[in-house]
């Protein structure tokens, strides 16, 4: 295989969310795994909705995820290229003007459906004479422009779906240019793919039906159609569409909630594949494990619980230096290596460490049941002498077990509740030296 050249083409009209990040990630893993090239194309032909702020935000999101790009360009700087391509198609009699209004087209669709025919455009505009067109324009009508499909069957081997074909006689000639002269997605995308040397187009399966027309436009413009891979769309754990949750699943929102970039990437890389959903420490590992052959045909279920589990697994393994600056920002008291190592396995997010600060450095209210009061008040005399270490908890509880006959939960739980004010938490062997002898004695008294 030659080194692939792929592109991720977001529109700067909103924040990146898990759906389009998954597309970016699959493109990135495939290209990087084959020593290829990953291009970021900004699809900003919608000048009214596209903003510089959203473009900057999506670049920040991709950088945060580690999905760096080799080249980048914006479609808004390339209108002359699209105009030239449109002129070429006109010269080939493959781009023709149509004057129907949206209402008239809707009536045509409804009539076709009532007659049991597919709602395919009838190409009435091809019958217009030059005088007909002049008369319509004199009445204020402005044309939209359609690409004339061949009517033949277009075939390709999809890297995910296998052999695919589209009968272009069964679909409408696609509109490439609107009445106001602005371009729809199709023509600029094909022009850019040809000029950027894109070898593989990887996108969601909602684009499958567009592929036949796009392949014919590639051929008409003298280009070679890239290989294609159409991946199943994401759905929620309940099987419902994610569209209503997209705001809460934006990269900005997930980052603010404390998710690690590699948790998100691990989750999205493994969703809908034959691999187990497990955390990976680096993008390079994900690249090594990626293959289109692993992607299934069923919709991929995005489950918050899986994402939380992956995030927790990564947090549990994080060394102190990886989180030091974040802990300082959250609460300087938490920014010590012994504290982090003691609490990290009780954290789903790095910020969860702060919930354990008061247990160690504050004054939590002891929880002492009436039947445990005598045991707790007498426990102090068995506390090992000198500075407390990670070995002190075991020595202390063994001494208490021998002296009182208590064992198991009846021994450990009253001590934990008296010292931390909680029934659950980090390992007491790590917590005891953090609390320190003086505070341990205070909390037992």
UniProtKB/Swiss-Prot annotation:
The keyword Iron-sulfur belongs to this UniProt entry's keyword annotation: no
UniProt main location, coarse: cytoplasm
InterPro entries registered for this protein in UniProt: aa-tRNA-synth_I_cd-bd, aa-tRNA-synth_I_codon-bd_sub2, aa-tRNA-synth_I_CS, aa_tRNA-synth_I_cd-bd_sf, Glu-tRNA-ligase_bac/mito, Glu/Gln-tRNA-synth, Glu/Gln-tRNA-synth_Ib_cat-dom, GluQ/Sye
Pfam families, sorted: Anticodon_2, tRNA-synt_1c
Compartments where located: Cytoplasm
Family in the record: Belongs to the class-I aminoacyl-tRNA synthetase family. Glutamate--tRNA ligase type 1 subfamily.
Protein name as it appears in the record: Glutamate--tRNA ligase 2
Designated gene of the protein: gltX2
């Amino acid at each position: 295989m030659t080194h692939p050249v792929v592109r991720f083409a977001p529109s700067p009209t909103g924040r990146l969310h898990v759906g389009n990040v998954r597309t970016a990630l699959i493109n990135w893993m495939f290209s990087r795994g084959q020593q290829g090239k990953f291009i970021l194309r900004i699809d900003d032909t919608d000048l009214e909705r596209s903003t510089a702020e959203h473009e900057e935000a999506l670049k920040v999101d991709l950088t945060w995820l580690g999905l760096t790009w080799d080249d980048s360009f914006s479609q808004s700087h390339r209108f002359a290229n699209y105009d030239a391509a449109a002129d070429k198609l006109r010269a080939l009699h493959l781009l023709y003007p149509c004057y129907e209004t949206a209402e008239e087209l809707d009536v045509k669709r409804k009539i076709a459906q009532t007659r049991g025919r597919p709602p395919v455009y009838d190409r009435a505009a091809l019958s217009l004479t030059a005088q007909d067109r002049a008369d319509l324009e004199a009445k204020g009508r402005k044309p939209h422009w359609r690409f004339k499909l061949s009517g033949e069957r277009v075939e390709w081997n999809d890297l995910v779906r296998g052999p695919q074909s589209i009968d272009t006689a069964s679909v409408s000639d696609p509109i490439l240019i609107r009445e106001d002269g602005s371009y729809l997605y199709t023509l600029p995308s094909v022009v850019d793919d040809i000029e950027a040397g894109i070898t593989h187009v990887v996108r969601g399966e909602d684009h499958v039906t567009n592929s036949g027309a796009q392949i014919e436009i590639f051929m008409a413009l003298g280009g070679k159609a890239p290989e294609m891979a159409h991946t199943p769309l994401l759905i929620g754990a309940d099987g419902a569409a994610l569209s209503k949750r997209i705001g809460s699943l934006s990269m900005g929102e997930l980052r603010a909630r404390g998710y690690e970039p590699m948790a998100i990437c691990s989750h999205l890389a493994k969703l809908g594949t034959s691999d187990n959903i497990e955390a990976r420490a680096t993008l390079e590992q994900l690249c090594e494990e990626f293959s289109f052959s692993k992607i299934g045909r069923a919709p991929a279920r995005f489950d918050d619980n899986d994402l939380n589990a992956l995030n927790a697994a990564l947090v549990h393994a994080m060394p102190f230096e990886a989180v030091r600056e974040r802990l300082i920002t959250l609460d300087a008291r938490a920014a010590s290596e012994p504290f982090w190592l003691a609490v990290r396995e009780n954290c789903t997010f790095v910020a969860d460490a702060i919930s354990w600060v008061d247990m160690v450095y504050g004054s939590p209210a002891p929880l002492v049941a009436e039947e445990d009061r005598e045991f707790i008040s007498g426990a102090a005399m068995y506390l090992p002498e000198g500075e407390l270490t990670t070995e002190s908890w075991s020595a202390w509880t063994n001494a208490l077990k021998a002296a009182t006959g208590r064992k198991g939960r009846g021994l450990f739980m009253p001590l934990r509740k008296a010292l931390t004010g909680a029934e659950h938490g980090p390992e007491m062997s790590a917590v005891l030296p953090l609390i320190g002898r003086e505070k341990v004695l205070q909390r037992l008294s």
